[in-house]
Design a protein with these regions (language model features):
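Short, hydrophobic/aromatic beta-strand segments
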Residues: 79-88, 126-130, 200-211, 251-252, ...
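Surface-exposed beta-loop interaction hotspot
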Residues: 138-223
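Short, solvent-exposed loop/turn segments enriched in Ser/Thr/Gly
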Residues: 65-71, 125-132, 185-192, 256-261
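Terminal connector regions
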Residues: 121-162, 248-284
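C-terminal motif of bacterial Sec signal peptides marking the signal peptidase cleavage site
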Residues: 13-17
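Beta-sheet-dominated interaction scaffolds and their linkers
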Residues: 28-73, 77, 160-190, 288-297
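Bacterial signal peptide processing site
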Residues: 18-22
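Intrinsically disordered, low-complexity Pro/Gly/Ser/Thr-rich segments with frequent PxxP/GP/PP motifs
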Residues: 92-124, 215-251
C-alpha cells in the first residue's frame, strides 16, 4: 500500500507543478480550457494486503485537452506487475469503443495513466449509462467500472456537441493577423473573431462574451463583451477584441497549451452555452509575437 500511496503523491506533486486548469475537443479545449482539475482522487484500496483488483479513473489535464484526449489511470492493487496488451473504453456517449494508447508496465501496487483519444463526433443527445474499461493482460480480460468524478466525458460531450451545432450555423475562428496600434513595449493589439454563416436559414447565434487567457486579456480589463448577433443566412461578422498581455513573466510564455485558446460564451437560438475557440498555428504565433513585443521582451 505504501508504494501505491507514494506513487499517487508523486503524481499529485508532479501534476500540480506542471499543469493548469482547463475542457473539449480534438485540438480544442487555460483559464479557458474546458477540462477540469487533473487529479480527481482515485478510489484507493483499503489498507492491508492487496485486494487483487485493478481500479480505473478518468482524468484530464490542460495539455490533454489541448491534444484532444483524456487519460485512464489504472491502479494495480495486485501482487504482480501488470502489462496491458489492450485497453478499451466504451461509453454510450461515444459512437464506438476508444482504444488506450502508450500501453506499458503498471507495477504492483502502483498506477499508470494511458491516453484515450476523444472522438471528434460524439453521440450528441440523451445517452445514459456508465462507461466501462476492458483491460487485457497476461492472457485474460477484465471489465472495470470507471470513476469520473470530474465529469471529463460529460463536459467534453456537451462542449463538442455545442461546437458542432455552432459549426452548422456559423463557424467561429480567429483571424491569423493581429493588428497593433504601434510597435514596441506597451502596445495594444486587436484580435478579430470571425463568424462566417453557412447560409442555412432560421438560426441566430449571439456572442455574449470572450474570456482571456493566461497570456492575453482584454485591453479594458475583465472579459470582452462584443455582444455580436449572427444570422445563419446573414453576412460575415468580424468582432474586434482590443488585447494586451495579461502577464509578462517568462513562465506565462512557456505555458503554451492555453495561451491562445479563448472561452466564448454564446447563445444558439436562445440556448446558452460556451465553447473554446483556439487560434490557428499562424494566428497563435502572431498573437504570442505581439505579446512578447508589447511586454518588451
Amino acid at each position: 500500500m505504501s508504494r501505491l500511496l507514494g506513487a499517487v503523491l508523486a503524481a499529485l506533486l508532479c501534476c500540480t507543478s506542471c499543469t493548469g486548469t482547463s475542457g473539449p475537443g480534438p485540438g480544442r479545449a487555460g483559464s479557458p480550457e474546458p477540462s477540469v482539475p487533473t487529479l480527481s482522487p482515485i478510489r484507493l484500496p483499503p489498507k492491508g494486503p492487496p485486494t487483487g483488483r485493478l481500479y480505473a479513473d478518468l482524468r484530464q489535464s490542460s495539455r490533454d485537452a489541448a491534444l484532444g484526449r483524456m487519460e485512464v489511470w489504472i491502479a494495480n492493487d495486485t501482487r504482480r506487475d501488470v502489462t496491458p496488451t489492450r485497453i478499451t473504453y466504451t461509453d454510450p456517449r461515444f459512437r464506438r469503443p476508444v482504444p488506450g494508447e502508450r500501453l506499458r508496465l503498471d507495477p504492483s501496487r502502483s498506477e499508470r495513466g494511458y491516453p484515450l483519444a476523444l472522438p471528434a463526433v460524439p453521440a450528441c443527445g440523451k445517452h445514459r449509462g456508465p462507461g466501462r474499461m476492458r483491460v487485457t493482460y497476461a492472457g485474460r480480460t477484465v471489465t472495470l467500472p470507471v470513476t469520473d468524478d470530474n465529469d471529463v466525458v460529460a463536459r467534453y460531450v456537451a462542449s463538442r456537441c455545442l461546437e458542432l451545432a455552432v459549426d452548422r450555423v456559423a463557424p467561429l475562428r480567429f483571424a491569423d493577423r493581429v493588428r497593433v496600434d504601434r510597435p514596441g513595449e506597451g502596445s495594444t493589439g486587436t484580435l478579430v473573431l470571425v463568424a462566417r454563416p453557412t447560409g442555412v436559414p432560421g438560426h441566430v447565434l449571439r456572442i455574449d462574451a470572450v474570456g482571456g487567457t493566461p497570456l492575453l486579456g482584454a485591453a479594458a480589463g475583465a472579459a470582452w463583451r462584443p455582444r455580436g448577433r449572427v444570422r445563419s443566412d446573414g453576412p460575415v461578422q468580424r468582432l474586434e477584441l482590443p488585447v494586451r498581455p495579461a502577464r509578462c513573466d517568462d513562465h506565462v510564455f512557456m505555458e503554451s497549451a492555453g495561451a491562445t485558446a479563448f472561452l466564448v460564451s454564446l447563445r444558439l437560438d436562445g440556448r446558452p452555452g460556451s465553447l473554446v475557440v483556439r487560434m490557428s498555428p499562424a494566428g497563435a504565433s502572431a498573437a504570442i509575437a505581439f505579446a512578447r513585443d508589447s511586454c518588451g521582451h
